[in-house]
Amino acid sequence: MSSSKVAVVTGGTSGIGKATALALQKAGCTVYELSRRAEGVEGLRHISADVTDEAAVNAAVAQIVAETGHIDLLVNNAGFGISGAIEFTAPEDAKKLFDVNFFGMVNMNRAVVPLMRAAGHGRIVNLSSVAAPVPIPFQAYYSATKAAVNAYTMALANELRPFGVTVCAVMPGDIHTGFTAARKKVAEGDAIYHGRISRSVQRMEHDEETGMDPAKAGAYISAVALRDGNRHPLYAIRFDYKFFTFLAKVLPARFLNWLIYCLYGK
């Protein structure tokens, strides 16, 4: 059994997930990272599990509880991206994106929430994106999954508030990770769209490749995960992305969408 806080991070073998897991370990937590990979990160406790497989998720959570006795923190980070025009993106690809980015999170929370509720405490951090309040053209399905994460997070936070379990979502912006290379690209229709698909994706990839160090993002997410109290349901990383999310709140939808078009749609 573990006397330290036990943290679980999905998608914890690379990128933001790995950085978050290492930051939590540095803060003194016992950290389990879950991913589909057979091997994990040195120094962390690895469980090979696919978050879209409910039985595998339940088995992983049961193993952690058997070994430690409790789960205090859950960071739902597992996810990937798709780019392309909506009309040319196959429905099965969009459904797979929702299965991982949204329902994978749901599977983890369904397994962990009863434990935290019974214990009378716990913290859940769901990884969202600035693309939730600022939906990006030619990344519509990714933006939609993250908007769903935000709505779900706010609802779950209020459901669990009386039980001492706090829930929030963190919305990163452009981070320099393997996420960019792993993105599934649907290039079909670029000529019809007069090259706007490729230009939009190239701009996004440039912003990501020159973006924030994942270690800084992981440190921020770790700090949010370890924060006491039910302060905010949604967090953005870095001032410029906080400014974007502020604009999304105060600007008329028509003007906001025009601004997004100028940045990523032309």
What is each PLM-predicted segment?
Residues A27-E42:
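Conserved glycine-rich Rossmann-like NAD(P)H-binding loop of the short-chain dehydrogenase/reductase
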Residues N109, T145-A148:
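Active-site helix of classical SDR
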Residues P162-R231:
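SDR active-site lid
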Residues A85-I86, D93-K95:
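Substrate-binding pocket helix/loop in short-chain dehydrogenase/reductase
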